[in-house]
Amino acid sequence: MLVLGIESSCDETGLALYDTERGLLAHALHSQIAMHREYGGVVPELASRDHIRRALPLLEEVLAASGARRDDIDAIAFTQGPGLAGALLVGASIANALAFAWDKPTIGIHHLEGHLLSPLLVAEPPPFPFVALLVSGGHTQLMRVSDVGVYETLGETLDDAAGEAFDKTAKLLGLGYPGGPEVSRLAEAGTPGAVVLPRPMLHSGDLDFSFSGLKTAVLTQMKKLEAAHAGGAVLERAKADLARGFVDAAVDVLVAKSLAALKATRLKRLVVAGGVGANRQLRAALSAAAQKRGFDVHYPDLALCTDNGAMIALAGALRLARWPSQASRDYAFTVKPRWDLASLAR
C-alpha cells in the first residue's frame, strides 16, 4: 500500500510517500522559520498562506524523487489536528481535493500519533510495546504505546510544554527565533553548576510535568543579571551559565520522569519523539541513563524530529493496514484544532 502524507499543522509544510512493503520512498519539507523570525513567533495567517504556496511544488518533488505516479497512490493521509485551524484547513483541503480528483480515499491523522510512530521509520524500528516521551513546543507527555492506536497517557504537563519553556527562556535571554535551538547552543557555552535552577515536580510521585515555575526562575535570575551587569562580555557569559542551568534542569526532569515511567510499566524500551527530541543534551542524558539502567532508547532521524509528512504517511499506512474501514471517500472533511490523543485509544 502506497500512502501520500500531508502535514500542515503549524509552520512546516511536509509531504511524503510511504509504502508498507518498501518503507519511506521520499519526503520533502519546507520550514517557515525564516518567514516568522522577524515576528519572533508563528503568525497563523502567514503560515496558512505559505502552506498554499508550497504544497503542490513539494508534491511534484516527492513524486519525482520516488518515481511514483499518482495512479500508484492508494490513499492520502493528512493531519486533521491538533494545530492551527487555518493551517490544518489548507492541508486538509489539498488532501481532499487531490483525493477527489484522483479517486482516492483519505484518512485524517492525529498529529501527535504521527510523532509517536515516527521512530518506526528507522532501519531497525523498536517493537511494541514501549514508553514514549512526546516532547515538543506544544506538548509534553509520557505514553504507553502497546500498538498502533493503543495508547495510554501516563503523565503530561500541567501547564507549559517543555518546548514552550525553551522558547520563552530564549526570549527572556534575548535570543532569536526559533528559541529552543538557540537556548541549547548558548547552554553549551555555559559552565555546569554555575546556576542551579529548580527541578519542578521532580519528586511529585507521579509522571506529570510542570515547566512554568522553571520559566519564572529564569526570569528572576535574568533580572538579577541585568541589574548586576550593565552589559558586555560579563553579561553574555552569565547568560550562557543561566541557559545551561535551565537546560540542565529541564533535561533532569524529562529523564527522571521517563525512568519512572519505564519502572511503572516494567518496560525496557523508551521512544523519544517531537522537536525537543533533537536536543543534544537530552539525548546524551538519556543515552547515559540507558547504559546505566539497562534499557533501550530510540529516536527518529534528526530530520524527522520536526513536523513532517513522513510520519503522517506512516501513520496513515499503518492505520489503513489494520482498519481498512477508516478509509473515507466522503470529502466533506473537518479539522480538529484541539484533539485529545487519548480519544484514539481502542
Swiss-Prot record:
<feature type="binding site">
    <location>
        <begin position="134"/>
        <end position="138"/>
    </location>
    <ligand>
        <name>substrate</name>
    </ligand>
</feature>
<comment type="similarity">
    <text>Belongs to the KAE1 / TsaD family.</text>
</comment>
<comment type="function">
    <text>Required for the formation of a threonylcarbamoyl group on adenosine at position 37 (t(6)A37) in tRNAs that read codons beginning with adenine. Is involved in the transfer of the threonylcarbamoyl moiety of threonylcarbamoyl-AMP (TC-AMP) to the N6 group of A37, together with TsaE and TsaB. TsaD likely plays a direct catalytic role in this reaction.</text>
</comment>
<dbReference type="GO" id="GO:0061711">
    <property type="term" value="F:N(6)-L-threonylcarbamoyladenine synthase activity"/>
</dbReference>
<dbReference type="InterPro" id="IPR043129">
    <property type="entry name" value="ATPase_NBD"/>
</dbReference>
<dbReference type="InterPro" id="IPR000905">
    <property type="entry name" value="Gcp-like_dom"/>
</dbReference>
<dbReference type="GO" id="GO:0005737">
    <property type="term" value="C:cytoplasm"/>
</dbReference>
<feature type="binding site">
    <location>
        <position position="111"/>
    </location>
    <ligand>
        <name>Fe cation</name>
    </ligand>
</feature>
<dbReference type="Pfam" id="PF00814">
    <property type="entry name" value="TsaD"/>
</dbReference>
<keyword id="KW-0819">tRNA processing</keyword>
<dbReference type="InterPro" id="IPR017861">
    <property type="entry name" value="KAE1/TsaD"/>
</dbReference>
<dbReference type="GO" id="GO:0005506">
    <property type="term" value="F:iron ion binding"/>
</dbReference>
<feature type="binding site">
    <location>
        <position position="180"/>
    </location>
    <ligand>
        <name>substrate</name>
    </ligand>
</feature>
<feature type="binding site">
    <location>
        <position position="115"/>
    </location>
    <ligand>
        <name>Fe cation</name>
    </ligand>
</feature>
<feature type="binding site">
    <location>
        <position position="307"/>
    </location>
    <ligand>
        <name>Fe cation</name>
    </ligand>
</feature>
<dbReference type="InterPro" id="IPR022450">
    <property type="entry name" value="TsaD"/>
</dbReference>
<dbReference type="GO" id="GO:0002949">
    <property type="term" value="P:tRNA threonylcarbamoyladenosine modification"/>
</dbReference>
<keyword id="KW-0963">Cytoplasm</keyword>
<feature type="binding site">
    <location>
        <position position="167"/>
    </location>
    <ligand>
        <name>substrate</name>
    </ligand>
</feature>
<feature type="binding site">
    <location>
        <position position="279"/>
    </location>
    <ligand>
        <name>substrate</name>
    </ligand>
</feature>
<keyword id="KW-0479">Metal-binding</keyword>
<keyword id="KW-0408">Iron</keyword>
<keyword id="KW-0808">Transferase</keyword>
<protein>
    <recommendedName>
        <fullName>tRNA N6-adenosine threonylcarbamoyltransferase</fullName>
        <ecNumber>2.3.1.234</ecNumber>
    </recommendedName>
</protein>
<keyword id="KW-0012">Acyltransferase</keyword>
